[in-house]
């Protein structure tokens, strides 16, 4: 997969070919057709939110499901999807009611687990 990868803060993103692992239980692989780099990414790129590097940026995306992991039933390969990954605690009242986008702990950047970048 080709991805925009941050390898060092305050440096331009690099477009790299990366390896991907197969999807695990309850995960899907999406062939991303378009992705945005937003203010969250900008804060990471500038070192405002320290993160382990290298990191794939662009967590707001649209694409096509290409592979399902075990247990996935809501989508199937060929489905068009949009997503915006946001970290969430899984325990607050919003997460407990399925509204993870409102999670009160979502700005805790230690919870951000994005794609790890490994060169192909």
Task: Annotate each PLM feature.
Residues 1-2:
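Extreme N-terminal starter segment of soluble prokaryotic enzymes
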Residues 5-12:
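Extracellular beta-rich ligand/substrate-recognition surface
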Residues 17-19:
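Generic structural detector for well-ordered beta-strands
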Residues 21-35, 45-96, 101:
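Glycine-rich beta-strand-centered segment in the early N-terminal region that forms part
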Residues 43, 89-120:
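NAD(P)H dinucleotide-binding glycine-rich loop of Rossmann-like/cofactor-binding domains
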